Amino acid sequence: MERFEALKETYPELYKYCHKAEQYVQDDPDASLLKAGKALEYMVKTLEKNQLEPVVWIHEKRTDCINELEQHGTIGEEFADELHQLRILCNDALDERKEEEATQEEAEKGLKLLTTLTVRFTAVMDKLSHMRKTGKVTPAPMGINRKKAAKAGKILALGGVIAAAALTVIFGSKE
């Protein structure tokens, strides 16, 4: 059984992209990463359309969409990080300003990530489908993204210091 065969029936378009990415790894790493990027885009858009939280708008940038999927609890932090890794790998390899072509090593790394991501994708889609069928449509909290929470805390603290300084300048010190 080939690597992406399980996708063939349920997600034929995703299967097509993944299968092509696998076929092109050795002979055309650029094409492999292009197809991996198409597979990534398909997964992100499909998750966005099927998330349980109401979608206010469809994001144009994959970065924003992945972040929102994580914030809404549709996907976990690890899944989001891996989506970003593949996104960055594909973007960097296919950057038109880059003179050299993508390497086979980059394409193999992309394929490895793609393999993991398709497993996670099907699991999340199955979970969302089950939640809709059972009427339990509130996803369980996926946990706190510690990196983002720490960054937000620093920003809030800095904002507080700036606000205090501004108030002191405006109203003067009590001394």
Predicted segments with their positions:
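Membrane-engaging insertion elements
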Residues: 171-175
